[in-house]
Amino acid sequence: MTTILKHLPVGQRIGIAFSGGLDTSAALLWMRQKGAVPYAYTANLGQPDEEDYDAIPRRAMEYGAENARLIDCRKQLVAEGIAAIQCGAFHNTTGGLTYFNTTPLGRAVTGTMLVAAMKEDGVNIWGDGSTYKGNDIERFYRYGLLTNAELQIYKPWLDTDFIDELGGRHEMSEFMTACGFDYKMSVEKAYSTDSNMLGATHEAKDLEYLNSSVKIVNPIMGVKFWDESVKIPAEEVTVRFEQGHPVALNGKTFSDDVEMMLEANRIGGRHGLGMSDQIENRIIEAKSRGIYEAPGMALLHIAYERLLTGIHNEDTIEQYHAHGRQLGRLLYQGRWFDSQALMLRDSLQRWVASQITGEVTLELRRGNDYSILNTISNNLTYKPERLTMEKGDSVFSPDDRIGQLTMRNLDITDTREKLFGYAKTGLLSSSAASGVPQVENLENKAK
């Protein structure tokens, strides 16, 4: 059976991930007119720029959907977001600022929950708005087929018949109007935005050019912290974790994690926390650029890692970072539920996150400017009395340190001999100033 259909399967049920925007509206109406039987599925991901979710399925029915369903994905999305924080599943960083993989997390949830809903309705063909140059086409492909082994893929934007008739937004708008729907195109922004409760992605158009900065973006989850006319008073916030799970903000507990994440977004968003500008590698190895918002994820991540560094030893922290980056890449590639990812997730959640209990108090200022004011945990292995510079009882003595220095550094003689051996072969140059052979200065090599 062919997995990817290049042309519209006339007379068959097709499930379309329906956002209510111009693209999916025109696609749904076109498919119905051409003889397919479209079913519309809309994911409620807590998108901060969506005002009326219930209206979206109603519009789908007006455009010819056989049936339209709104699938509440918020609880599962937040659960996956917290899991990503527990595992440090983030691999794109620039200058210490992190992209929290909020779009990949959203695709993992959407790609499984919508296809599961389609399967309930006997719909085994799926279409969405992803293009062939992006990451989402592969993410949705993988998650869809993981959920339904019988699934076939039909994407209008890979169908030459659809492209020839409705290849651009102007053509789609005219098509909708000609069919009796007063669909006016929204004002074109200088970039494209995709969002869910965990974060927002701004990319494409003017943002494809690196001389266009964050200053052209209107944040939808935060504030323009770079604009000095925007008043942003400093604010203290306390985050509490229990066994790796965020349970309270400023002493307030929440009935569910969705409400907790919304409050974290509000707190971080007041300062523009978690906004970053990243150049990344897409799945196809071409580089792209995005500007991201994730105020709640950033707030929880900062507090989590503060507790992490105070609780776990150096080797555990090193494995957390290494495995977290590896897991972040798998998440980015649409492999969040693959066995290699589950293995890493289980290890990090079981042996790292389970010990993260305590409170961190932060002072948030503008953007990603913050200070850590206090860290409290019964699990801290940070013991200031072990290293105090004051006179008093000590857990080890000067004689203990002499023994440690002797035993820990028995290889100094071997290292010295190797360095002079490298110098004899020309790999290193002798240094009269330091007495130790060193790599020759690049400027000297150029001469």
Curated annotation (Swiss-Prot):
<dbReference type="GO" id="GO:0000053">
    <property type="term" value="P:argininosuccinate metabolic process"/>
</dbReference>
<dbReference type="Pfam" id="PF00764">
    <property type="entry name" value="Arginosuc_synth"/>
</dbReference>
<feature type="binding site">
    <location>
        <position position="99"/>
    </location>
    <ligand>
        <name>L-citrulline</name>
    </ligand>
</feature>
<keyword id="KW-0436">Ligase</keyword>
<feature type="binding site">
    <location>
        <position position="280"/>
    </location>
    <ligand>
        <name>L-citrulline</name>
    </ligand>
</feature>
<dbReference type="GO" id="GO:0000050">
    <property type="term" value="P:urea cycle"/>
</dbReference>
<dbReference type="GO" id="GO:0005524">
    <property type="term" value="F:ATP binding"/>
</dbReference>
<feature type="binding site">
    <location>
        <position position="129"/>
    </location>
    <ligand>
        <name>ATP</name>
    </ligand>
</feature>
<dbReference type="GO" id="GO:0005737">
    <property type="term" value="C:cytoplasm"/>
</dbReference>
<keyword id="KW-0028">Amino-acid biosynthesis</keyword>
<feature type="binding site">
    <location>
        <position position="135"/>
    </location>
    <ligand>
        <name>L-aspartate</name>
    </ligand>
</feature>
<dbReference type="InterPro" id="IPR014729">
    <property type="entry name" value="Rossmann-like_a/b/a_fold"/>
</dbReference>
<keyword id="KW-0547">Nucleotide-binding</keyword>
<feature type="binding site">
    <location>
        <position position="139"/>
    </location>
    <ligand>
        <name>L-citrulline</name>
    </ligand>
</feature>
<keyword id="KW-0963">Cytoplasm</keyword>
<feature type="binding site">
    <location>
        <position position="194"/>
    </location>
    <ligand>
        <name>ATP</name>
    </ligand>
</feature>
<comment type="pathway">
    <text>Amino-acid biosynthesis; L-arginine biosynthesis; L-arginine from L-ornithine and carbamoyl phosphate: step 2/3.</text>
</comment>
<feature type="binding site">
    <location>
        <position position="136"/>
    </location>
    <ligand>
        <name>ATP</name>
    </ligand>
</feature>
<dbReference type="InterPro" id="IPR048268">
    <property type="entry name" value="Arginosuc_syn_C"/>
</dbReference>
<feature type="binding site">
    <location>
        <begin position="17"/>
        <end position="25"/>
    </location>
    <ligand>
        <name>ATP</name>
    </ligand>
</feature>
<dbReference type="GO" id="GO:0004055">
    <property type="term" value="F:argininosuccinate synthase activity"/>
</dbReference>
<feature type="binding site">
    <location>
        <position position="203"/>
    </location>
    <ligand>
        <name>L-citrulline</name>
    </ligand>
</feature>
<feature type="binding site">
    <location>
        <position position="131"/>
    </location>
    <ligand>
        <name>L-aspartate</name>
    </ligand>
</feature>
<dbReference type="InterPro" id="IPR048267">
    <property type="entry name" value="Arginosuc_syn_N"/>
</dbReference>
<feature type="binding site">
    <location>
        <position position="201"/>
    </location>
    <ligand>
        <name>L-citrulline</name>
    </ligand>
</feature>
<comment type="similarity">
    <text>Belongs to the argininosuccinate synthase family. Type 2 subfamily.</text>
</comment>
<dbReference type="InterPro" id="IPR024073">
    <property type="entry name" value="AS_multimer_C_tail"/>
</dbReference>
<dbReference type="GO" id="GO:0006526">
    <property type="term" value="P:L-arginine biosynthetic process"/>
</dbReference>
<dbReference type="InterPro" id="IPR018223">
    <property type="entry name" value="Arginosuc_synth_CS"/>
</dbReference>
<keyword id="KW-0067">ATP-binding</keyword>
<dbReference type="InterPro" id="IPR024074">
    <property type="entry name" value="AS_cat/multimer_dom_body"/>
</dbReference>
<dbReference type="InterPro" id="IPR001518">
    <property type="entry name" value="Arginosuc_synth"/>
</dbReference>
<dbReference type="InterPro" id="IPR023437">
    <property type="entry name" value="Arg_succ_synth_type2_subfam"/>
</dbReference>
<feature type="binding site">
    <location>
        <position position="43"/>
    </location>
    <ligand>
        <name>ATP</name>
    </ligand>
</feature>
<comment type="subunit">
    <text>Homotetramer.</text>
</comment>
<feature type="binding site">
    <location>
        <position position="136"/>
    </location>
    <ligand>
        <name>L-aspartate</name>
    </ligand>
</feature>
<feature type="binding site">
    <location>
        <position position="135"/>
    </location>
    <ligand>
        <name>L-citrulline</name>
    </ligand>
</feature>
<keyword id="KW-0055">Arginine biosynthesis</keyword>
<protein>
    <recommendedName>
        <fullName>Argininosuccinate synthase</fullName>
        <ecNumber>6.3.4.5</ecNumber>
    </recommendedName>
</protein>
<feature type="binding site">
    <location>
        <position position="192"/>
    </location>
    <ligand>
        <name>L-citrulline</name>
    </ligand>
</feature>
<dbReference type="InterPro" id="IPR023434">
    <property type="entry name" value="Arginosuc_synth_type_1_subfam"/>
</dbReference>
<feature type="binding site">
    <location>
        <position position="131"/>
    </location>
    <ligand>
        <name>ATP</name>
    </ligand>
</feature>
